[in-house]
């Protein structure tokens, strides 16, 4: 699955107003499609919601085999299996998409992607309780922990345009590791401190002067909440650092020195903020930390 290292790709999305990361992902797909002629993909009957259409590229069919948009129908498991098959065939770069809560149906094939070293990209939108009118059946809770528990799968939950760009560049550059992009339905404001450091999986997005007394760690839609909480705590005289953790797996791939610089052991007061299950955050917050 050799490919160009798109992590050095200079084109990053710009964001001037609040926008959903699913929409930003759709823009990134349409930026990358010209850079990756073999890029092909689609959704399990949720294309308009997942924002996965490549504009002007036509629909794949028996009559139009050159079409780059695949309509898989309501069959998430088969879709992911087909995605693996496309990648194993070679010459093409595939992505598949559905609602995040339906990653339960995708999981067996995602596990095979990870086992086989197939760098398929999973676009998973509507990532928390902010899913609209569908209610609890469509509200993912434990799915994020489930995917993060899978060896050789990178799970990216970006907070804005910059991090969404980093997520797609990481996915497009991967040679042996599949990537899951976990994206919002609701609009998120751009975060001033977000940067290409997101390519490292975790980084300081908003810092204080000197040594922090408290570290707030968040991903996706909760990064904005962490930044707002920092402002309130600092108004009370507390030194706070905010760490954005869009991809735990990538963060763990960084050097011990880098990880220590971002999350110094000496700072034991830590709070993780994420609108899903707290499972998996213990290694970052420690025994003295908390989860919201």
Model-derived features: positions:
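Thiamine diphosphate
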Residues: 1-292
């Amino acid at each position: 699955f050799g490919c160009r290292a798109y992590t050095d790709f200079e084109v990053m999305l710009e964001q001037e107003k609040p926008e959903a990361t699913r929409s930003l992902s759709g823009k990134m797909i349409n930026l990358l499609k010209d850079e990756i002629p073999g890029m092909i993909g689609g959704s399990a009957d949720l294309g308009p919601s997942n924002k996965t259409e490549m504009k002007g590229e036509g629909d794949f069919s028996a009559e139009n085999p050159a079409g780059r948009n695949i309509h898989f129908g309501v069959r998430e498991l088969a879709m992911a299996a087909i995605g693996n098959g496309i990648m194993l065939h070679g010459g093409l770069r595939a992505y598949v998409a559905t609602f995040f809560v339906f990653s339960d149906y995708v999981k067996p094939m995602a596990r095979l992607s990870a086992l086989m070293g197939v760098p398929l990209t999973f676009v998973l939108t509507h990532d928390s309780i902010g899913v609209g009118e569908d209610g609890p059946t469509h509200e993912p809770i434990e799915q994020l922990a489930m995917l993060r528990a899978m060896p050789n799968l990178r799970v990216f939950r970006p907070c804005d345009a910059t991090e969404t760009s980093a997520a797609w560049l990481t996915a497009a550059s991967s040679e042996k590791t599949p990537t899951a992009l976990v994206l919002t339905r609701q609009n998120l404001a751009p975060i001033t401190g977000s940067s290409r450091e997101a390519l490292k999986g975790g980084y300081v997005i908003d810092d204080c002067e000197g040594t922090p007394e408290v570290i707030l760690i968040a991903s996706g839609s909760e990064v904005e909440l962490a930044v707002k909480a920092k402002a309130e705590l600092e108004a009370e005289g507390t030194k706070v650092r905010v760490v954005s953790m869009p991809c735990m797996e990538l963060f763990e791939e960084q050097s011990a020195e880098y990880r220590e610089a971002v999350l110094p052991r000496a700072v034991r007061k830590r709070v993780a903020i994420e609108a899903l299950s707290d499972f998996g955050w213990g290694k970052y917050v420690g025994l003295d930390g908390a989860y919201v």
